[in-house]
UniProtKB/Swiss-Prot annotation:
One Pfam family from the record: ACCA
Name of this protein: Acetyl-coenzyme A carboxylase carboxyl transferase subunit alpha
PROSITE patterns named in the record: COA_CT_CTER
InterPro entries: Acetyl_CoA_COase_a_su, ClpP/crotonase-like_dom_sf, COA_CT_C
The gene coding this protein: accA
An example molecular function term from Gene Ontology annotations: acetyl-CoA carboxylase activity
Length: 317
């Protein structure tokens, strides 16, 4: 997969292009030694990347959360879990490809993994409905959660959606009811639930698999009731004010941690999760393992009480 750069990364992209060009020349003509120049440019690129990513504003973080190269749920499943067995369908209407889920092992322990899934190619994006689930997707997720509850398996969810699908068919099949039912049922599950926002956390579409004992966010992910463009269109009547909206919405991991709405921020590799997927997956795996260890001593009653108190604390500063 070719590397893509956002506009604020263009100076970095130019340096990387120069490095690749020098490497190509060096490989074509072994008599030309360009190692020192390549090392100098690599150091300069790393320093520029550090400087750029040390000062990202909320709008830039929003765009990083949607980066086309960013790892999706199936990428993390491949790197973190073993023996993944995908389960399909809501047993009522259809199998929604915008939600993936199934049984897997995490360091040998059976777990239920559920997450939003976007696509990379045009065909795959359409098949996954751009990561926007219909009611049958959320009902599939709930079916798998109830299965995990019966067999005492921890539930791991990965959140990455611009929102629930707002189409007429989805509304006719009960989109709001499906989301509301998931919120209610997840609050009562008797097994540990660990949720992580890996990209976009868009409104009720994210919350429908986001009620948990631990809620984490990747460093450059977002979590909000509406997209910055949507907010700008409502408040300023112009999507061009999206950058202003992003700042006032408080949608970054750092801001939500300050408000105690999430538990942990999972560090991303320099330049974002897509720059080193294996390292990002390892960071996320260690956070999930730490969360499971933290929840392990709790009895079912304590787990449910802790989750209830957590939910009831929302809205208080």
């Amino acid at each position: 997969m070719s590397q893509e750069y956002l506009d604020f990364e263009l100076p970095i992209a130019e340096l990387e292009a120069k490095i690749e060009s020098l490497r190509a020349v060096s490989e074509q003509d072994g008599k030309i030694d360009l190692d020192d120049e390549i090392k100098r440019l690599q150091k300069k690129s790393e320093e520029l990347t550090k400087k750029t990513f040390a000062n990202l504003d909320a709008w830039q973080v929003s765009r990083m959360a949607r980066h086309p190269n960013r790892p999706y749920t199936l990428d993390y499943i491949e790197h973190i879990f073993t023996e993944f067995d995908e389960l399909a369908g809501d047993r009522a209407f259809a199998d929604d490809k915008a939600i993936v889920g199934g049984i897997a092992r995490l360091d040998g322990r059976p777990v239920m993994v559920i997450g939003h899934q976007k696509g990379r190619t045009t065909k795959e994006k359409v098949r996954r409905n751009f990561g926007m689930p219909a009611p049958e997707g959320y009902r599939k997720a709930l079916r798998l959660m109830e299965m995990a509850d019966r067999f005492n398996m921890p539930i791991i969810t990965f959140i990455d959606t611009p929102g629930a699908y707002p189409g007429i068919g989805a509304e006719e099949r009960g989109q709001a009811e499906a989301i509301a039912r998931n919120l209610r049922e997840m609050a009562q599950l008797k097994v540990p639930v660990i949720c992580t926002v890996i990209g976009e956390g868009g409104s009720g579409g994210a919350l429908a698999i986001g009620v948990g004992d631990k809620v984490n966010m990747l460093q450059y992910s977002t979590y909000s009731v509406i997209s910055p463009e949507g907010c700008a269109s409502i408040l300023w009547k112009s999507a061009e004010k999206a950058s202003t909206a992003a700042e006032v919405m408080g949608l970054t991991a750092q801001r939500l941690k300050e408000l105690n709405l999430i538990d942990s921020i999972v560090a991303e590799p320099l330049g974002g999760a897509h720059r080193d997927v294996a390292q990002m997956a390892e960071n996320l795996k260690q956070q999930i393992l730490a969360d499971l260890q933290d929840l392990a001593p709790l009895s079912t009653e304590d787990l449910l009480d802790r989750r209830y108190q957590r939910l009831m604390s929302y809205g208080y500063v």
